[in-house]
A protein has these predicted regions:
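Short beta-strand/loop motif that positions the catalytic acidic residue
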Residues: 223, 229-231, 235
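Alpha/beta-hydrolase fold catalytic core
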Residues: 1-37, 59-62, 100-101, 281-282
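Active-site loop/oxyanion-hole signature of alpha/beta-hydrolase fold enzymes
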Residues: 21, 66-110, 126, 275
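Conserved HGGG/HGGXW glycine-rich cap/lid loop of the alpha/beta-hydrolase fold
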Residues: 24-74
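Flexible "cap/lid" loop of the alpha/beta hydrolase fold
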Residues: 116, 120, 124-162
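Conserved alpha/beta-hydrolase "acid-adjacent" motif
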Residues: 236-242
């Protein structure tokens, strides 16, 4: 199987659709046995973005749970629409459905943001079901602040132009290239382009709006579990200041800085995520 095929395929495992009260159906895949590791992807992405991370994790004695965020991949959007509280509620539902105890929640980009909202909204769930969290290329709101890339791309998303840009191989690949650091394989760019083109439609604009408008930094002190904060030093989407604040204001947090790496840590440094998860589960 080629690298591109390995990246784009849906992982094999037990497929579950969790029904939410508003009609949302959350597409989940689980595999393995042992302490639970939950992988939460970012905006316009899908659970497939974790294929390289999964390749490493499956060598460990862990149970991995991946899911498509509502409105992404095979997960639908229910009557309550797209909002940070609704999506934090989805996290809660997944933790409860899989009866997670002493789990490690790994959130990338928006997935990390929603982990913060989960901890703020449902602190008892985090304290009883999670052993630790890992916030990768993450933030806690006001995501346009200090990011020229976001200030340029958000108007394109709001205008409904992003899918058209991403469907153009030249324009799309040029844009996706900015999500990575110094060195990147062409397969990573192409697979990311295809996935984001399918999910960045105009009816998903609420996903952008709540990350721009909401500020959950004042709530970071409420996070009571050990937290690893991972950031690429060339991240243009969630610049360094976000991870600096996460690391400084979450009581039991530790920063990891990745030289030459951009926003797409799940592709650029999956071995780092795997290594840190191993330390957390053990």
């Amino acid at each position: 199987m080629s690298l591109a095929d390995r990246l784009i395929r849906i992982p094999e495992g037990i497929v579950t659709f969790i029904e939410r009260p508003d009609g949302t159906r959350l597409h989940c895949i689980s595999m393995g046995e042992g302490p639970t590791v939950i992988l939460a992807h970012g905006i316009f992405n899908e659970l497939r973005c974790f294929n390289l991370v999964l390749q490493h994790l499956l060598n460990r004695k862990v149970r991995v749970v991946l899911f498509d965020q509502r409105g992404h991949g095979q997960s639908s959007i229910g009557a309550d629409g797209l909002g940070s509280r609704q999506m934090a509620g989805d996290y809660k539902a997944i933790l409860e459905f899989f009866d997670v105890k002493d789990g490690v929640l790994v959130g990338h980009s928006m997935g990390a943001f929603l982990a913060v909202v989960l901890a703020e909204t449902y602190p008892s769930v985090v304290e009883t079901r999670l052993k630790a969290m890992m916030l990768v290329s993450g933030h806690a709101g006001v995501v346009a602040k200090g990011s020229v890339q976001n200030q340029l791309q958000i108007p394109l998303i709001r205008a409904g132009l992003m899918p058209r840009i991403l469907r153009s191989q030249w324009l799309g690949r040029s844009f996706i290239r900015t999500l990575f650091g110094k060195e990147v394989r062409e397969e990573y760019i192409e697979v990311t382009r295809l996935i984001l083109a399918a999910n960045s439609t105009k009816d998903r604009i609420a996903l952008v709006d709540f990350q721009v408008k909401e500020d959950h930094y004042p709530a970071l002190g409420q996070i009571k579990v050990p937290t690893i904060v991972v950031c690429g030093e060339q991240d243009r989407t969630c610049p360094r200041w976000h991870s600096e604040r996460l690391g400084a204001e979450i009581p039991d947090a530790r920063n990891i800085w990745l030289s030459g790496v951009g926003h797409a840590v799940v592709y650029e440094a999956p071995e780092i995520i795997d290594h840190e998860v191993g330390l957390l589960v053990n």
